[in-house]
UniProtKB/Swiss-Prot annotation:
This is Pantothenate synthetase. (R)-pantoate binds at Q60, Q152. The reaction proceeds by a bi uni uni bi ping pong mechanism. GO terms for molecular function: ATP binding; pantoate-beta-alanine ligase activity. It comes from Legionella pneumophila (strain Paris). The active site is at H36 (proton donor). Transmembrane segments: none annotated. Belongs to the pantothenate synthetase family.
Amino acid sequence: MQIFHNLNEWIRFRNSLSPDLSLGFAPTMGNLHAGHASLFLASSKENHYTVSSLFVNPTQFNNPDDYKHYPRTVDADLELMTQNGVDFCILPNENEIYTDGYAYQVQENRLGQLMEGKHRPGHFNGVLTIVMKLFNLVKPTCAYFGEKDYQQLLLIQGMVKALFMDIEIKSCPTVREKSGLACSSRNNRLTPSQREIADEFAKIFHQNKSSAMISKELEALGITVEYIEEFQGRRFAAVKIGDIRLIDNYLL
């Protein structure tokens, strides 16, 4: 796997590649897990080359403490990429990415105001802006995103369509732990007792009951429910276990 620490080096290399070659792209913020690995493997099966990126994007954190405490596990992340078919990895720094000081932003004013957008103001502006920048740098044929962040997936699909970007967005199923808990970088921050509660969250959330009944059961376990909502035939949830925020969704 080739690693690019400098964006100008990457741009020169990207421009040297034949336009006949397909590039799959799976952007990440690091602290990788089995869900990320599934994106890399899907891309490597369908493209000549697979590209990933490691960049903890400050503009999508509405809570500065979350950004500060986001785990940086670069060596382990690069190893996981190497083992799962990534050919090129870009590791840009913040000054390279935000040469404009975040003066220019991508904003969506409908879906981006619901659920995650309502509870995390500015989050999706940061997500869409960084994804747009990375798309322009990588120029992928296809880009791969997990269904765990389904609202994000819909917004990226919408952005690509609205802005006439010649990129195919591929969705990959949520990868879950044995308990049914969705794989997430945040799971690593759970204490053993919180992990047990998180496993119960996954089981209760997937019950064939009303959102109100599910909320009541979760709250009885001491879980803070931010929202449980149904949208476009899926059920979405965001909860807090202690100070760890978890999200999930599934097709009804």
